[in-house]
C-alpha cells in the first residue's frame, strides 16, 4: 500500500512544532503563542476526522513545524540549535514507541486526556490549571517510560515552575503527534531513506500558504 506522504509530513511537522516550541520556551521563557495553542489543542481532540483536523484543519497552523522539519531534514550541522531540535524530535519518537509497547499505558493516557476535556469546560486551554494538568500527565505517564528528554536552555528560565509546566505540556503534544505519525504510516527509516520525499512535500505545503506579513 502506497504511503500517504502528505499525512506523514503533517504529523511529522506536528512533532517538530513541539520540538521548536520546547526550544523557544527553554531559551526564552516564551514561545509562538498561536503555534502553542494548536499543539496543545491537538492533545484534546481524540477523534479527529483527518490528520489535518488534529491541527485545527489548516496547514498554516503547522507553519512553525514545517519550517522546523525542513531544518531537521537538511541539518548539515549536528551542533547548536539544530542539533537540539533533531534530538528532541528523535527522543519523542523513541518515547512514543515505548508508550505503545508499555502494557496499559495508552489506555491510561486516554483516560487522563478525557479528564482534561472535562477541565476545559471550566478553564482556558492555556490557563495554569490546564498547563499543570497536562504537565502532570507527561510526568506520570510518559516520563517513567524513559529515557527522559534532557531539555537544554537558560538555567534561569528553566527554574520557573510555569515554564517547566509549559515545556512538559508541549512535550505531551509532541507525543500526541508521534502517535498520529505512526498511525498514518510514519516510521524512522523514512528520515533516512525518504528524506527527499518529505522535504519536497513540506516545501509544497509551505509554498501555498499565504506569506506572513
From Swiss-Prot:
The record's section on InterPro entries has: HflD (IPR007451), HflD-like_sf (IPR035932)
| A Gene Ontology term for the protein's cellular component | plasma membrane
* Pfam families for this protein: DUF489 (PF04356)
Q: Where in the cell?
A: Cytoplasm; Cell inner membrane
Extract the coiled-coil ranges from the record: 99-126
Q: Which UniProt keywords apply?
A: Cell inner membrane, Cell membrane, Coiled coil, Cytoplasm, Membrane
Membrane topology term reads:
Peripheral membrane protein
- Family assignment from sequence similarity: Belongs to the HflD family.
Q: What does this protein do?
A: Negative regulator of phage lambda lysogenization. Contributes to the degradation of the phage regulatory protein CII. Acts probably by holding CII on the membrane surface, away from the target promoters, but close to the FtsH protease.
Subunit structure, as described in the record: Interacts with CII protein from phage lambda.
Q: What is the protein name for this chain?
A: High frequency lysogenization protein HflD
Q: Which gene encodes it?
A: hflD
Amino acid at each position: 500500500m502506497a504511503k500517504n506522504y502528505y499525512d506523514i509530513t503533517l504529523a511529522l511537522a506536528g512533532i517538530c512544532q513541539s520540538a521548536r516550541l520546547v526550544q523557544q520556551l527553554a531559551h526564552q521563557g516564551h514561545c509562538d503563542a498561536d503555534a502553542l495553542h494548536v499543539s496543545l489543542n491537538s492533545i484534546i481532540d481524540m477523534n479527529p476526522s483527518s490528520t489535518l483536523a488534529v491541527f485545527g484543519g489548516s496547514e498554516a497552523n503547522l507553519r512553525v513545524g514545517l519550517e522546523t522539519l525542513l531544518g531537521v531534514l537538511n541539518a548539515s550541522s549536528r551542533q547548536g540549535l539544530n542539533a537540539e531540535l533533531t534530538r528532541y524530535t528523535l527522543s519523542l519518537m523513541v518515547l512514543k514507541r515505548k508508550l505503545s509497547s508499555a502494557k496499559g499505558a495508552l489506555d491510561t493516557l486516554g483516560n487522563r486526556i478525557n479528564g482534561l476535556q472535562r477541565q476545559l469546560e471550566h478553564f482556558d486551554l492555556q490557563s495554569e490549571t490546564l498547563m499543570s494538568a497536562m504537565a502532570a500527565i507527561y510526568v506520570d505517564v510518559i516520563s517513567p517510560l524513559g529515557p527522559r528528554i534532557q531539555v537544554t536552555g537558560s538555567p534561569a528560565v528553566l527554574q520557573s515552575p510555569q515554564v517547566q509546566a509549559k515545556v512538559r505540556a508541549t512535550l505531551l503534544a509532541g507525543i500526541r503527534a508521534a502517535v498520529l505519525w505512526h498511525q498514518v504510516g510514519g516510521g524512522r527509516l523514512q528520515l533516512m531513506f525518504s528524506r527527499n520525499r518529505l522535504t519536497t512535500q513540506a516545501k509544497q505545503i509551505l509554498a501555498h500558504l499565504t506569506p506572513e506579513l
